[in-house]
Structure formats: C-alpha cells, structure tokens
C-alpha cells in the first residue's frame, strides 16, 4: 500500500523529466527523475517540485525545477497544495532565491551543506591546502590508475558486474542503508543521460 505522494502516478515522471529538460534547475534537480518521487506541477507556469511524503511531512528533493522555477508563486502554491492535504512541507536543499521566498512567509532555515562549483579551466591543485590532492594524484599516476568517462551502456558485462560487486560490498560493510535519496545507487547509473567516471588500474 502506497501512502499519498510516496510514488509518482503513471506519466508524472515522464512529464517531470520533460519540464526539467526544457531548462531550469539546481544541483539536485536531475535526482528528481529517480523512482520513488511524487511530483507537483505548478499551475499556469513551467515548473514542478519532486517530493516524498513520510507521515504528514512532505519533503522536497531540492527546489522547484523548470523554466519558471524562480517565480515566487511556485513555492507559495506548493505550500498551499500541502496545506490542503494536511501535510507540513519541508524544502530540502534549496538555493538562495527559493529561500528568500520562504523567508517572506516567515519560515526558518537550517544550513545542511555548502555547494562547491569548480571551473575546470581555472582550477589548480597548487597551494598548501591541496597537498593531499596532489599526493593522491601522483600516487595514482605511479600505480597506473587512470580516470575514464563512460556510460553504463558502454561498459562491458565484466565492468558492470564489478561495479555491482563493489556497491554490494560497501552496503554489506555499513550499519546504515544505501543513501539512495541523495546519492543514488547502481539503478540510477543505468540512465542513458548519466555519465560515469570510473577509475581503472594498470591491470584493466
């Protein structure tokens, strides 16, 4: 038995992905395409919000996405949508624009992380603070480890089996479940739109 909002209705996931692909989103927006999310579509504008309901709490996965995601009315309308169903909305990992809208509604906020964006054209490993990164890079080079961009469909059967084995071993060694809600798992790697970077040693 599924609780309200615990899973998307047929077609909602495809519709949400189309909204996302038309443009407009944050660092977590692609995660909204994963299974297990429900979707709310803003009336009259091109925006949507992915969420999951636990008890009477509706937790969003990031903020709104879509071309009209920055419209202040989107967050307000989602709050009203939740209120009509007796849910308390919680906006998880939203940007400053969306936070400002919620501030106007008298909401409080708690910082859970910081987002770092690196420009590959200007980033450098130079400097004392990045000594550990240089050490790891040099060691990998000595041991013949190289990085390779690929997709799940391009991997060989052997590579796929090894990745599954690594994933299962990681889960078996932990006392907590795989954190699919924010980090994803093997299932999410199989999406054709997802690029993978794998590290190969000198023997492969």
Each PLM stretch: what is its role?
Residues 5-56, 63, 87, 91-109, ...:
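A conserved beta-strand-loop-helix scaffold within acyl/acetyltransferase catalytic domains
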Residues 60-69:
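Glycine-rich phosphate-binding "P-loop"
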Residues 69-80:
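Conserved acetyl-CoA-binding loop-helix of GNAT-fold acetyltransferases
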Residues 73-75, 130-132, 136:
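"Short basic amphipathic alpha-helical interaction patches in structured regions
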Residues 79, 99, 137:
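Short glycine-/small-residue-rich flexible loop motifs, especially phosphate/cofactor-binding loops
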Residues 114-121, 138-145:
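Acidic/polar active-site rim loop that often engages polyanionic ligands
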């Amino acid at each position: 038995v599924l609780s309200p909002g615990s899973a998307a209705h047929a077609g909602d996931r495809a519709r949400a992905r189309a909204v996302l692909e038309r443009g407009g989103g944050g660092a977590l927006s692609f995660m909204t395409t994963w299974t297990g999310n429900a979707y709310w579509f803003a009336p009259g504008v091109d925006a949507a919000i992915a969420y999951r309901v636990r008890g009477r709490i509706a937790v969003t996965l990031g903020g709104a996405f879509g071309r009209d995601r920055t419209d202040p009315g989107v967050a307000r309308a989602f709050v009203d949508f939740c209120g009509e169903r007796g849910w308390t909305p919680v906006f998880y990992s939203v940007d400053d624009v969306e936070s400002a809208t919620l501030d106007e509604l008298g909401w409080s906020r708690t910082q859970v992380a910081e987002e770092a964006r690196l420009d590959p054209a200007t980033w450098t490993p130079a400097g004392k603070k990045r000594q550990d990164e240089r050490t790891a890079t040099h060691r990998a080079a000595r041991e013949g480890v190289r990085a390779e961009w690929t997709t799940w469909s391009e991997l060989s059967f052997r590579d796929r089996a090894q990745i599954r084995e690594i994933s299962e071993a990681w889960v078996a060694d932990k006392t907590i479940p795989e954190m699919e809600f924010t980090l994803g798992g093997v299932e999410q790697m199989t999406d054709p739109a997802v690029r993978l970077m794998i590290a190969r040693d000198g023997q492969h």
